[in-house]
From Swiss-Prot:
Record-listed Mg(2+) binding positions: D493, D499
Lineage: Bacteria, Pseudomonadati, Pseudomonadota, Betaproteobacteria, Burkholderiales
Catalyzed chemical reaction(s): RNA(n+1) + phosphate = RNA(n) + a ribonucleoside 5'-diphosphate
Annotated GO MF terms: 3'-5'-RNA exonuclease activity; magnesium ion binding; polyribonucleotide nucleotidyltransferase activity; RNA binding
Protein name per UniProt: Polyribonucleotide nucleotidyltransferase
Subcellular location: Cytoplasm
Cofactor: Mg(2+)
Domain of life according to the entry: Bacteria
Residue ranges occupied by any KH domain in the UniProt entry: 560-619
Organism annotation: Burkholderia multivorans (strain ATCC 17616 / 249)
Length: 715
């Protein structure tokens, strides 16, 4: 009899067979599940602390998705030959898993929970992110932790006007959509996608299709819990202190109502801090008078936050103006300026209300492309977008350094939004880096990065297919009343039930991201929200087109210029030279960057047109073939008793025999030629060994004959 109580569930899902198992590996974790999808295997584990730390006032959930190089049969690079800091892909996948799980833990549950997913085996055609999300959901479900799941997930492609469930990487190449949706039996919780300018109804159809298809996975997790789940935790939320809630409401509500009539963010924030401080002080006075201990600040802070949410949500649902005085459909005032920075290749300052992005575009060569060593194999990225939000953007102090998960996620969303409208590498051979520096933030900075990014690219002369704009939306739902908010503020983001970001062109959507905190948002509500988002997007696109009608036709004088030439692939080694000596000398002496592809396409880039022309000429000379009958201006390299060695082209010499110098007999070659002398010669013979015979005499004879017949000699 086995020492393991192993439980296995299998199901067919789209074109793949999925296997879930628990009870054999990582038994000391609160929950552990192995997910196997056609040889892509992940181990998802969950550990929950039995009690919350004293004074804990937030839910400490961490999700770590870790790719092991052995899963693809590789040994890691680097000196230590072991996995190091998380890659950008691992960070993004960790966020993807975190987002649908977090809202399903009960309010007031502050025990530390850690979800760790290891990728153990990889089929290059099956991405590991969906198996990882299903595994994390299943591990939480079998652990017995208080979790309102399970969660299912699906990737949806759109190929030949048909939705495809969990496509392979090969299918994704021909898809106009890459959408990941996660949710429970009843509701969608998270959407992450990029698309090729698709209409809103196609995007929403993909969300609904994915949600329907994920029910198979949810059913399998339920069966796994039934046969292999641990007992549910006996956890109850701490009873609410109704007397304290009533007292805090009595003290703070009038002041909070007054604070939310202040339209300026900084002034409102100052007033709210004063209300929090005054409320705590008043409660301490009450406790002192009663001879009791004052309530801890974390509890009071949570009550005040709930009170703020109630006030703001109530005002909006009752049709009153929003925090900054707008109605639900109005976009904040927009100002646009391009060409902001004098020596960059392209720049734009995009300001929407109290959110501002300074976005810079830089053009580079093929050598500047990012090389990514992924599990599935190495590939190159010609378009990079980096998002930075320093603490001063919100008037705060804080750490400045390497990007945090949020910054990486926002950068990827902005990149997804723009990539569909970039020209192909054949149309525009440059590598492109866009950096968005958030200089002010009050909501929707990632969408400001999309708008500013598009404008900076156009300023740099990148021939974009269309203007791309992004807008952040919010939604508040109370019973059967709901309100969709256009262009949300930071405060509205925290207090709403759904926030979603839509980016796209006048033709359609290029990126959609949704995060839903409650279970009650129907397809019809999402339809209304997407229609209102389109209205907002079209307004912003109008402002952008007014400011910048299209891409600059001239590149910045500081951007590199490029020319391409085609050479015989067999000649590549001649251009590179032994140990790279020839190409190194070429780049240093001409001040150019030279990239050579395996098929013989040579790209020469430089800010100097003279340098490019010189490099082109030299490469053409190196790769040129010596042809019989051709005339060359050569240099005498060496004098011999029987003739001279003449250099015709780089690395290509020929013999000028003593009998081929002039018509008369030559007694001493030194009387006619000197080393270093320029001499015009004609190729009269080559052999299979590459030896070349030259003649100067032939040109003299041709000149004499031409003089007699009045026809010009061969040049």
């Amino acid at each position: 009899m086995s020492m393991f109580n192993k439980v296995v569930k299998e199901f067919q899902w789209g074109q793949h067979k999925v296997r879930l198992e628990t009870g054999e590996i990582a038994r000391q974790a609160s929950g552990a599940v192995i997910v196997d999808v056609e040889d892509t295997v992940v181990l998802a584990t969950v550990v929950g602390a039995k009690s919350a730390k004293p004074g804990q006032d937030f839910f400490p959930l961490t999700v770590d998705y870790i790719e092991k190089t052995y899963s693809a049969g590789k040994i890691p690079g680097g000196f230590f030959r072991r996995e190091g800091r998380p890659s950008e892909h691992e960070t993004l996948t960790s966020r993807l898993i975190d987002r649908p799980l977090r809202p399903l833990f009960p309010e007031g549950f502050y025990n530390e929970v850690q979800v760790v997913i290891h990728v153990l085996s990889v089929n290059p055609e099956i991405p590991a992110d969906i198996p990882a999300l299903i595994g994390a959901s299943a591990a939480l479900a079998v652990s017995g932790l208080p979790f309102n799941g399970p969660v299912g997930a699906a990737r949806v492609a759109y190929v030949n006007d048909q939705y495809v469930l969990n496509p392979t990487r090969e299918q994704l190449k021909s898809s106009r959509l890459d959408l990941v949706v996660a949710g429970t039996e009843r509701a969608v919780l998270m959407v992450e996608s990029e698309a090729d300018q698709l209409p809103e109804e196609v995007m929403l159809g993909a969300v609904v299709f994915g949600h329907e298809q994920m029910q198979t996975a949810i059913d399998a997790i339920h069966e796994l819990v039934r046969d292999g789940g641990k007992p549910e935790w006996d956890w109850q939320p701490a009873p609410k202190d109704e007397a304290l809630i009533a007292r805090v409401t009595e003290i703070a509500q009038p002041e909070l109502l007054a604070a939310y009539q202040i339209r300026d963010k900084q002034a409102r924030s100052t007033k709210l801090k004063e209300v929090y401080a005054a409320t705590s002080a008043k409660l301490e006075e009450d406790a002192l008078a009663a001879g009791t201990v004052a309530a801890d600040k974390a509890t009071v802070g949570n009550i005040l936050f709930d009170l703020e949410a109630k006030i703001v949500r109530g005002q909006i649902l009752n049709g009153e103006p929003r925090i900054d005085g707008r109605d639900t459909r109005t976009v904040r005032p927009i100002e646009i300026r391009t060409g902001v920075l004098p020596r960059t290749h392209g720049s734009a300052l995009f300001t929407r209300g109290e959110t501002q992005a300074l976005v810079v575009a830089t053009l580079g060569t093929k050598g500047d492309e990012q090389i990514i060593d992924a599990l599935e194999g190495e590939y190159r990225e010609r378009f990079m977008l980096h998002y930075n939000m320093p603490p001063f953007a919100t008037g705060e102090t804080g750490r400045v350094g390497s990007p945090k998960r949020r910054e990486i996620g926002h950068g990827r969303l902005a990149k997804r939004a723009l990539v569909a409208c970039l020209p192909s590498a054949e149309e525009f051979g440059y590598s492109i880096r866009v950096v968005s520096e958030i200089t002010e933030s009050n909501g929707s900075s990632s969408m400001a990065s999309v708008c500013g990014g598009c404008l900076a690219l156009m300023d740099a002369g990148v021939p974009m297919k269309a203007h791309v704009a992004g807008i952040a939306m919010g939604l508040i739902l109370e019973g059967n009343k709901f309100a969709v908010l256009t262009d949300i503020l930071g405060d509205e983001d925290h207090l709403g039930d759904m926030d979603f970001k839509v980016a796209g062109t006048a033709q359609g959507v290029t990126a959609l991201q949704m995060d839903i905190k409650i279970q009650g948002i129907t397809k019809e509500i999402m339809q209304v929200a997407l229609a209102q988002a389109k209205e907002g997007r079209m307004h912003i696109l109008g402002k952008m087109t007014e400011a910048v009608a299209g891409a600059n036709t001239q590149l910045s004088e500081f951007a590199p210029r490029m020319i391409t030439i085609k050479i015989n692939p067999e000649k590549i080694r001649d251009v590179i030279g032994k140990g790279g000596s020839v190409i190194r000398a070429l780049t240093e002496e001409t001040g150019t960057t030279i990239d050579i592809s395996d098929d013989g396409v040579v790209t020469i880039a430089s800010t100097s047109s003279e340098g490019m022309a010189e490099a082109k000429k030299r490469i053409e000379n190196i790769t040129a073939e010596i042809e019989v009958g051709q005339v060359y201006e050569g240099t005498v390299l060496k004098l011999l008793d029987f003739g001279a060695i003449v250099n015709l082209l780089p690395g290509k010499d020929g013999l000028l025999h003593i009998s081929e110098i002039v018509n008369e007999r030559v007694k001493d070659i030194n009387d006619y030629l000197k080393e270093g002398q320029q001499v015009k010669v004609k190729v009269i013979q080559t052999d299979e060994k590459g030896r070349v015979r030259l003649s100067a005499k032939a040109l003299l004879n041709e000149a004499a004959a031409a003089a007699q017949s009045d026809t010009p000699p061969q040049q």
